[in-house]
Amino acid sequence: MSDIKERLDKVRALIQEPEFLEGKGLSNEVNIRIFCYEPENEMVVRHFENQLETDQFLDCHLIVCNLYKTFLSICDDMDITDAIPDMEEADGSAYLLEQLNSAIGNGEFIDKIQYEPHEPGDVLMLTGVGEVFPFMRIHTLLEALQPYFSDVPILVMYPGEFDGRHVKLFNRLTPNDYYRAFNVID
């Protein structure tokens, strides 16, 4: 337990450092960092996220986006939330997933996440990656987000593994290629 808390403390310190905020040391790569953690530490990480979100003494402007809540908001906007349980019961989970994936893509997420103006010191923290699965996959969203947040560091709280080339949700699912991010804390 103390290992995860020590790693989270390092994240708190890192996101306030000028080098992180300016994307220095990344060889002109996009400033996307992934904080990987064991899925069984989910509640510790959520507590940390809540603390960060309410910390008024951070030396950065933290914008927190819970991807699961974003997904639910998109469903509400499309006026489909109430129909989802009935659709799943009538047509099955696979059909429901297919329909939701065809109706809700990266563009809908970007529309909800995007904000203006971006200010120096902003940090976009993406949470809820495990909760929103299988309705959204982080590797495809990160690819789509890059043009919109090229000037804002992105921190992904990820319940799984990232080896510098592949993300593996929950340490169990088939790895997906994603090579444009960096592990925030080893």
Language-model-derived ranges and their functions:
Residues 30-33, 37, 41-44, 48, ...:
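Extended, basic/helix-rich recognition subdomains
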Residues 62-110:
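Long, charge-dense
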Residues 137-186:
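Glycine-rich, aromatic-bearing surface loops/beta-hairpins
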Residues 17, 105-117, 138:
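A short, acidic, amphipathic alpha-helical segment used as a generic capping/interface helix at domain edges
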Residues 25-29, 115-121, 149:
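Flexible, charged surface loops at secondary-structure boundaries
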Residues 39-44, 70-71, 99-106, 130-134, ...:
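Short acidic, S/G/P-rich loop/turn micro-motifs used as interaction or catalytic elements
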Residues 3-81:
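N-terminal, charge-rich interaction modules
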Residues 119-135:
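Conserved P-loop NTPase "ATPase switch" module shared by AAA+ and STAND
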